[in-house]
A protein has these predicted regions:
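Amphipathic alpha-helical interaction segments
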Residues: 8, 30, 86, 90, ...
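C-terminal peripheral helix-coil segments that are non-catalytic and often amphipathic
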Residues: 122-132, 154-198
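Short, basic, alpha-helical segments at the C-terminal edge of helix-turn-helix-like DNA-binding modules
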Residues: 28, 58-65, 71
Length: 198
């Protein structure tokens, strides 16, 4: 029963997010009404509106992230560096496509949530590096890459002005990913250079 109410609240919040142009304008009362639950139930299960929205956006992101997550299962003949690159491009493309929801999630992840976004990247980085790096180095690399991309997305307007181009434009986004990967994996820069601007 408890799980049902929690799921009911989460599902109602996802529906409100899909219908809303401004996720931050959604109130706890809106969510309670849509879920047909008492207001206190939201605080009981989620402790705050921010935590609920974070979980709802995460659920929404997971539903919409099929392409991104499926990259991990692609043909193992493809070099892990290229699979990692494709995964990052899919992730960033999804973030741009669903920016009205993702901006909130990025802010929450960068400032308050547990560090979980990197968990999907660690196995690929481990494959890329083999035994050349320690586990700590692999985890720091994963965090640096993901948090840098999150920050670029979160401050897209300012970073676009700083770099002199629109960072949300697909080709420029790929260029940024290739640049970040070249910094972290210089041994593959020329071998798998895809972006002509590098």
């Amino acid at each position: 029963m408890k799980t049902d109410v929690k799921e009911q609240i989460l599902d109602a919040t996802v529906t409100l997010l899909l219908d809303s142009k401004d996720p931050e304008s959604i109130t706890v009362r809106d969510i309670a009404a849509a879920a047909d639950v008492q207001l206190a139930m939201i605080n009981y299960y989620f402790h705050s509106k921010d935590e609920l929205l974070y979980q709802a956006v995460g659920a929404l992101r997971n539903k919409m992230a099929g392409d991104w997550l499926s990259v991990k299962g692609k043909d193992k003949k493809m070099h892990p560096y290229l699979r990692f690159r494709e995964m990052l491009i899919a992730l960033c493309g999804m973030s741009v496509k669903y920016s009205q929801y993702m901006r909130f999630t990025v802010e929450y992840e960068l400032t308050r949530a547990e560090i979980v976004s990197t968990q999907h990247t660690i196995p690929l980085i481990r494959e890329i590096c083999g035994n050349k790096r320690s586990e700590t180095s692999i985890r720091i690399t994963a965090y640096e890459i993901i948090s840098t991309l999150q920050l670029i997305f979160f401050r897209a307007k300012d970073i676009s002005a700083y770099l002199g181009f629109d960072v949300l434009e697909y080709d420029r986004m790929v260029e940024i990913i290739d640049t970040i990967l070249a910094i972290h994996f210089p041994e593959y820069k020329n071998k798998y250079r895809v972006s002509k601007k590098l």
